[in-house]
Amino acid sequence: QRQMCIRDSFLPTNDRGGASSIPQEWRERTTILLGYVPPDQLKTFPNLKWVQSWNAGVDPYLAPGVLPGGVRLTSAVGAYGPAVSEHMLAMLLAIYKRLPAYRDQQRAHIWADLGPVGSLAGKTVLVGGAGDIGRHFARLVRALGAQRVIGLRRSAGCTVEGFDEIYGLGA
């Protein structure tokens, strides 16, 4: 369930459409929005002062004419790096060490060797995304011995901490 902060009250919304279920009288009283509101709906809040996005990326809000004048926009950049990158590492290691297959065998009371398992030591790791989450993940795999860490991002031409190389997606 998503919540949008409406002045002194919280109005829960269940639809991913954000503000579509908010009555007009609430829209007129709203000064702060928290969560996801489709950019094209921002103009329906005449007294809006601040939008706090749960997303790190807020590019859709930055297009000309989307954000009403004087409205402050903040994002969740930096909020998810450690937790999400640790989860990514856990999933990578589970797959690399064949933990799902061994779990399935254990449930079936089968104790067969599935062959050697690998290590990140000395390997090259490709990371899709070189933002906050990608940088945290790069540090984690490097700490486990990855020899090289390569990052993909929208555009190349810059260095990013924790990565040996950065390539652009050519969008």
Residue ranges and their predicted role:
Residues 7, 27, 45-46, 67-68, ...:
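Short, well-ordered coil/turn elements that cap or connect secondary structure elements
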Residues 17-25, 39-43, 158-171:
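Short acidic low-complexity segments
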Residues 29-103, 114-117:
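Phosphate/diphosphate ligand-binding glycine-rich loop within oxidoreductases
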Residues 7-20:
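A short beta-strand-loop structural module common to alpha/beta enzyme folds
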Residues 26-29, 106-125:
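Mobile, glycine- and charge-enriched loop segments
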Residues 116-171:
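Rossmann-like dinucleotide/phosphate-binding beta-alpha-beta segment
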Residues 2-6:
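Short, small-residue-biased leader/transition segments that mark boundaries at the very start
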